[in-house]
Design a protein with these regions (language model features):
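A structural micro-motif
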Residues: 1, 45, 73-74, 124, ...
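Conserved beta-strand hairpin/beta-sheet module of binuclear metal-dependent hydrolase folds
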Residues: 1-42, 140-152
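Short acidic-hydrophobic surface loop/beta-edge motif
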Residues: 6, 18, 117-123
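Short Gly/Pro-enriched turn/cap motifs at secondary-structure boundaries
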Residues: 6-7, 108-110, 130-132
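Residue-level detector of beta-strand structural context in well-folded domains
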Residues: 14-16, 111, 116-117, 139, ...
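Active-site neighborhood of phospho(di)ester-bond hydrolases with catalytic His/Asp-centered motifs
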Residues: 27-28, 48-55, 75-78, 130-133, ...
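Active-site HxH/HxHxD metal-binding segment of metal-dependent hydrolases
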Residues: 32-35, 41-118, 205-209
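Metallo-beta-lactamase
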Residues: 91-94, 125-212
């Protein structure tokens, strides 16, 4: 599997593209549709799924145009955040501080994640683990063969996700990272929702929220 990234201008958010021999998965389609479209066309493979680490607006701004353009591949999301796709107050686009932008309202998802299930299809193999705390339905995707994890807004390089938002919980976030991410081998690459890549070992050693 090959992994590509584009960076969206709204919230400097990362969209990921996972390429198998035959298909493509898109993770968290953010604000820059033109860049997302160009990357998909460059890869040139059919999209078999769209995975959402969570449903804050910056991670879903191109979701519906992506679906409409590429024959409606199924969208996977945590059930606890499924309604946020079409509820601006919960995906945060409807908050007063975002009055300068349009509300983000998407169609419902087709699939809910099953935690700890091993997903295997179209050349992909991954496990979904809960990493709530930044938002109640935050998840991470573990790819054992590629020895990496996509963490959304749970774990970043030398920091963690915000916990001052609706449904955020600092203790839940720390617990999820320690029990579902830091249990991975130290050499695993971490692909976060914002910022540069890191590793499990680096975060254990240098993340100020976990340094001993």
């Amino acid at each position: 599997m090959k992994i590509y990234k584009t960076i969206n201008p709204v919230a400097v958010q990362n969209t990921y593209y996972l390429e198998s021999d035959t298909h493509l998965i898109v993770v968290d389609p953010g604000s820059d549709w033109n860049k997302i479209h160009d990357k998909i066309e460059q890869i040139g493979k059919p999209i078999t799924a769209i995975l959402l680490t969570h449903t804050h607006y910056d991670h879903i701004m191109s979701l519906d145009i992506l679906r409409e353009t590429y024959h409606f591949p199924p969208v996977y999301v945590a059930e606890s955040e499924a309604s946020w796709l079409y509820t601006p107050e919960m995906n945060l686009s409807g908050l007063p501080r975002h009055d300068d932008m349009e509300n983000v309202i998407c169609k419902p998802a087709e699939q809910f994640f099953q935690f700890e299930k091993e997903y295997k299809f179209d050349g992909f193999h991954f496990i979904v683990v809960p990493t709530p705390g930044h938002s109640i339905g935050g998840v991470s995707f573990i790819f054992p063969e590629e020895e990496c994890v996509i963490t959304g807004d749970a774990l970043f390089r030398e920091t963690i996700g915000r916990t001052d938002l609706p449904t955020s919980n600092f203790e839940d976030l720390i617990y999820g990272i320690k029990n579902n991410l830091f249990t991975l081998p130290n050499h695993y690459t971490v692909y976060p929702g914002h910022g540069q890549n890191t590793t499990i070992a680096h975060e254990k050693n240098f993340n100020p929220f976990f340094k001993r």
